UniProtKB/Swiss-Prot annotation:
Entry protein name: Tetraacyldisaccharide 4'-kinase
Keyword Membrane included in the entry's annotation: no
Enzyme Commission number(s): 2.7.1.130
Domain of life: Bacteria
Keyword Ligase attached: no
Physiological role: Transfers the gamma-phosphate of ATP to the 4'-position of a tetraacyldisaccharide 1-phosphate intermediate (termed DS-1-P) to form tetraacyldisaccharide 1,4'-bis-phosphate (lipid IVA).
An annotated GO BP: lipid A biosynthetic process
One cellular component term from this protein's GO annotations in UniProt: plasma membrane
Organism of this sequence: Vesicomyosocius okutanii subsp. Calyptogena okutanii (strain HA)
Length: 315
């Protein structure tokens, strides 16, 4: 079902969307009136989330923020729920050597690229508490968790897909909305991942190089220009990645997998011998069985100096 259009199925599911909306409003109100207790912490918490389902590019922003504050001398940690991982009980401290099937792809990717402590727990508030106690951090960034109201936060950052925006503007399951669009009025910052809108900060994803998953060898962006390649993506919005490869002049054979999909070696065996291109998020799940034909596209997030000035002022 397409969550960006208003088809028959979308309308048929509207009664369920109404129930979802009322339940989410009630739940938030119960936290606001202290019927449910909010867990407070010894150090600031920055939440990077969204109000829709589907990929909006939160993780590159989390990595960028973590690296920035590390350079400022902060002891930074990151918490996540660990979607796609097999760890379901209590907290898991993720390092560069953690099994990706245990942690999930995003926690391991952050641990590898940002080189800092990462804690996974379905209960984000508990993840924050455990990270403070075990790793002596003084700033925590939550990858997602905008709707996890049990976790107190100092800064809220909402990330929006600049192309799809809010889809058909229906609530789940008829549409992509987790919360009302008005929720954006209460967050501290709105980041747009495509295009410019008043009141929103624009993030640029800078394409760097292709990196061989097995050897670490790097090749320039035009290396596969004019070649036939397989494009593999198990992310929230794979078409964005495929469009990027096509703009690089690649004759693409796309293969879409579910978000957080756990790859098996057999998934990436094709009859031809064309190169296989993937995202960094896909890469961490393929390292154990990688071959010389597997490459990932290295990207780097960039936000304006003005954004960081305003962020530090609020923090």
């Amino acid at each position: 079902m397409d969550l960006n259009t208003r088809g028959i199925i979308n309308y048929l599911l509207l009664p369920i969307s109404g129930i979802f909306y009322l339940a989410s409003v009630l739940r938030k109100w119960l936290y606001q009136v202290n019927f449910f207790k909010v867990k407070k912490f010894k150090c600031p918490v920055i939440v990077v989330g969204n109000i829709t389902v589907g990929g909006t590019g939160k993780t590159p922003i989390v990595i960028l923020l973590a690296q920035y504050f590390k350079q400022q001398g902060k002891q930074v940690g990151v918490v996540l729920r660990g979607y796609g991982g097999m760890h379901h009980k209590g907290s898991l401290l993720v390092s560069k050597n953690t099994n990706v099937y245990l942690s999930g792809d995003e926690p391991l990717l952050i641990a590898l690229q940002a080189d800092l402590p990462v804690m996974v727990n379905r209960n984000r508030a508990q993840a924050v508490e455990d990270l403070i106690n075990q790793c002596q951090v003084n700033l925590i960034i939550s990858d997602d968790g905008l709707q996890h109201y049990r976790m107190d936060r100092n800064i809220e950052i909402a990330v929006i897909d600049g192309t799809r925006r809010f889809g058909n503007e229906f609530f789940l399951p008829s549409g992509p909305l987790r919360e009302s669009i008005d929720r954006l009025k209460s967050v501290d910052f709105v980041i747009n991942n495509a295009g410019f809108r008043a009141g929103e900060f624009n993030i640029k994803l800078i394409l760097k190089v292709f990196v061989n998953v097995k050897t670490g060898e790097e090749k320039p962006l035009d290396y596969f220009n004019g070649e036939y390649c397989h494009g593999v993506a198990g992310i929230g919005y794979p078409q964005r990645f495929f469009d990027t490869l096509i703009r690089l002049g690649i004759n693409l054979k796309p293969h879409i997998f579910a978000d957080h999909y756990v790859y098996q070696q057999s998934d990436l065996v094709f009859e031809d011998n064309y190169p296989i291109l993937m995202t960094a998020k896909d890469c961490v799940k393929c390292i154990q069985f990688a071959n010389n034909q597997m490459w990932y596209l290295q990207v780097e997030a960039n936000l304006s100096d003005n954004f960081f000035k305003e962020l530090e002022a609020k923090l």
